[in-house]
């Protein structure tokens, strides 16, 4: 696999030069060469998981594929971590520092798609697909673990790498349940990545998120002949929704409440509906606020039941925290990303990505730096123009100020318990819509494979730096302690278990 080293200068266009390891230690070079030698294994696992396309908390084949591969590679593997069936933890090494690498492997419903095409074509009618690239995410984390293991194996140093298999990121929030159980506290640092349309070190906060299902039960009756005997569960759902609409005036600007009626009772209007359900999602950029807002939504559900003389059952689905940035770790990731450059694409790969980008609006300037800084935006625009293809074949500037994304991820829960940082590696052309068939198609190409392998190298190189120079971990820990001084408010009840909504 070829990569291009990119030097970013504030007042210049891209400069493409040959990749050099001049400043890399021989030990680090050797570890990264292990990843290069095993790229067929890494790509093969990515493709297997892509084929399985298992939904959240149902990733049995995907998880076992990783467990078997990790055992063959000499890791100690624990299945069913934190009593989550499709979770695992694979470790190698001894002593501190403990470096955690986070893997995901769940797919999305309704996104079945043939790989490598530039047109919509379902692989299986109504089937699932990896619209968020988690087949690549897990494979890249696996690659990183292989590289770190090689380093620990070849050098007489203290250190332990733990690859965590984290199911249900799209629904189930396994990392959040693991956080509730204290799993992440033992780590000195956690590193991960996500496929994107850009090469960058990710930063900034995200929304916390709590999902709860409310199931109302009433009494059926003839809506015309004996309406007084009926108690409408559907009325309760509607009154709950009205109550929440009035709550919106009394929450912060960044808070959000979404809902979906998952059961309207039936399709006969002349029946007083005896059952109805609604699924609520409460978001805020601070997990403590989300927890308090959720309590108010619970009271509205109780009030709706009282008004309609129905009963209700509350079913906790999942909850996750906002993300805590760690600039110290992000700087180490960026130094290694700069040194390793970004994946290089063939003419055929660029032609495919260019054609795929014609199927959606591919305009826009990518990356967190461009979103938050006008000077950075100008630089990235120049980089795009210089590169001249839909793939963003360059590394965007490091951004070290506050930033915010409205979405949610259970990586946030990890970041509240240990210093955490992540990168994005381009696996799709610019502006590729999230959770789309285009993503699924690109995930099953060499472009996707290159992203996974390269992410593994950047993460492994960073972990090696942390092991070799623990003062970097001290700096990251000091920043972490400052940012989390108010303490972690866990959104997961003590008795909750990961579930799939009805």
Enumerate the language-model features and the residues they cover.
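A short small-residue
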Residues: 26, 44-48, 119-127, 216-224, ...
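Acidic/His- and Gly-rich active-site-bordering loop/insert found
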Residues: 26-130, 135, 139-143, 147-159
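General structural feature for long, well-ordered alpha-helical segments within catalytic domains
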Residues: 27, 38-45, 58-69, 97, ...
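Divalent metal-coordination and catalytic microenvironments
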Residues: 49, 101, 134, 163, ...
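Histidine/acidic-residue-rich, glycine-tolerant segments that coordinate divalent metal ions
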Residues: 86, 108-110, 118-129, 135-136, ...
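Metal-dependent amide/peptide-bond hydrolase catalytic core
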Residues: 238-502
């Amino acid at each position: 696999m070829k990569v291009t080293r990119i030097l970013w200068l504030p007042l210049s266009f891209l400069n493409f030069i040959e990749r050099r390891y001049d400043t890399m230690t021989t030990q680090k070079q050797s570890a990264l060469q292990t990843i290069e030698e095993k790229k067929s294994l890494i790509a093969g696992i990515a493709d297997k998981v892509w084929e399985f396309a298992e939904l959240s908390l149902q990733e049995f084949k995907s998880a076992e594929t990783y467990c078997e591969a990790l055992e063959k590679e000499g890791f100690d593997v624990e299945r069913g971590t934190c009593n989550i069936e499709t979770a695992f933890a694979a470790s190698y090494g001894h002593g501190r520092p403990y470096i955690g690498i986070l893997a995901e492997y769940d797919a999305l419903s309704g996104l079945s798609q043939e790989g490598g095409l530039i047109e919509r074509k379902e692989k299986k009618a109504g089937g699932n697909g990896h619209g968020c690239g988690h087949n690549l995410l897990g494979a890249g984390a696996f690659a990183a673990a292989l590289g770190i293991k090689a380093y620990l194996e070849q050098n007489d140093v203290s250190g332990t790498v733990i690859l965590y298999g984290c199911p249900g990121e799209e629904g189930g929030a396994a990392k959040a349940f693991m956080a509730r159980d204290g799993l992440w506290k033992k780590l000195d640092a956690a590193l991960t990545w996500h496929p994107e349309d850009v090469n960058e070190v990710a930063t900034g906060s995200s929304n916390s998120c709590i999902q709860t299902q409310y199931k109302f039960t009433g009494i059926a009756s003839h809506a015309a002949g004996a309406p007084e005997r009926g108690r409408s569960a559907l009325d309760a759902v509607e009154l709950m929704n009205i109550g929440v609409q009035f709550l919106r005036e009394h929450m912060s600007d960044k808070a959000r409440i979404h809902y979906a009626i998952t059961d309207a009772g039936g399709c006969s209007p002349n029946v007083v509906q005896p059952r109805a359900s609604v699924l609520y999602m409460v978001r805020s950029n601070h997990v403590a606020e989300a927890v308090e807002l959720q309590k108010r939504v619970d009271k509205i559900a109780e009030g709706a039941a009282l008004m309609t003389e129905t009963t209700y059952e509350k079913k906790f689905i999942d909850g996750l925290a906002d993300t805590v940035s760690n600039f110290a770790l992000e700087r180490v990731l960026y130094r290694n990303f700069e040194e390793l450059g970004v994946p290089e694409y063939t003419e055929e790969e660029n032609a495919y990505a260019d054609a795929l980008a014609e199927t959606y609006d591919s305009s826009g300037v990518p990356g967190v730096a461009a979103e938050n800084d006008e000077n950075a935006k100008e630089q990235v625009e120049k980089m795009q123009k210089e590169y001249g293809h839909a793939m963003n074949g360059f590394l965007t500037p490091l951004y070290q100020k506050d930033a915010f994304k409205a979405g949610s991820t259970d990586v946030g829960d990890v970041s509240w318990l240990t210093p955490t940082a992540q990168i994005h590696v381009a696996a799709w052309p610019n502006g590729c819509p999230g959770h789309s068939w285009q993503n699924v198609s690109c995930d099953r190409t060499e472009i996707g494979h290159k992203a996974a392998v390269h992410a593994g190298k950047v993460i492994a190189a960073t972990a090696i730096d942390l092991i070799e120079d623990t003062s970097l971990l001290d700096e990251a820990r000091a920043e972490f302690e400052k940012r989390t001084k108010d303490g972690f408010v866990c959104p997961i009840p003590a008795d909750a278990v990961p579930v799939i909504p009805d």
